[in-house]
Amino acid sequence: WRVLGDIEDFIAALALERGMSEKTCIGYGSDLRLFAAYLKRRKIENAADVKREDIVDFLANEREKGMKGSTRARRTAAIRMFFRYLKERHAIPTNPSDLMDAPKKALALPRVLSEAEVFAMLDEVKGEDPVSLRDRAMLEVMYGCGLRVSELCALKNDDIVADGELLRIFGKGSKERIVPIGGAAGRALSAYLGGSRESFARGNLAETHVFLTRTGRPFTRQGVFKIVRARAAAVGIAADRISPHVLRHCFASHMLSHGADIRAIQELLGHADIGTTQVYTHVDAARIGEIHRKHHPRA
């Protein structure tokens, strides 16, 4: 069946040619296979036979099933990119998604913890044993440098540069950026590297990756997630309020509230689009509004 084959080729191209993350490729692949199943039910076998109305009807049906606006936006983006890919390769005469309106996503404000909550979580990891030193370094680096969990897991010894003052990070699409290591993060990282990392090191991968599990393997996203939740639970932070990405949100939001320039935060986070970073201005406005409501006598 031609459409499904075209989709598999497109997903492979996303990873190989455009450097998109595995998570994005999986999401787009899932969206497009749903679309392909819909086309099959309508007896449409070739991408060249798809009309704008077919796409609109598919998205309308998904919306009627209760699909969130954010999911609809992603599916629309996947379909647009798929047909653009086919058109660029002259596999279809026209792009049926060209005249479609992009669905508007509701602004979803990032979840953030207060500074006091983050500090309590970091201060809770007090031990000098190897696991405590490692966990403290991981938490401090995530919060102090604003890393994505995938970037933390991929961090290698060679990525610690400038005598331990900077990290070289390879973000989405393998884009490189340089991030300063703050004082607290730097001290925690030095303590881990100098004191406990060698107790986890075994095997070839232990020679390259910074953060290692008890078996000497690099961390997975799920492994980091478990540590973050466990350390947060120890100071009473509910599981639904914390994740590695929440610490990244806290990094940006707390810097903004202390007067950091939005463009500088964009660079540190590795956002290609300033619009992605500007959501934190809404978070700060919401925080200021809450303070006003709590403390102004006539609020």
Regions found by a protein language model. Name each.
Residues 1-299:
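Conserved catalytic core of the tyrosine transesterase superfamily
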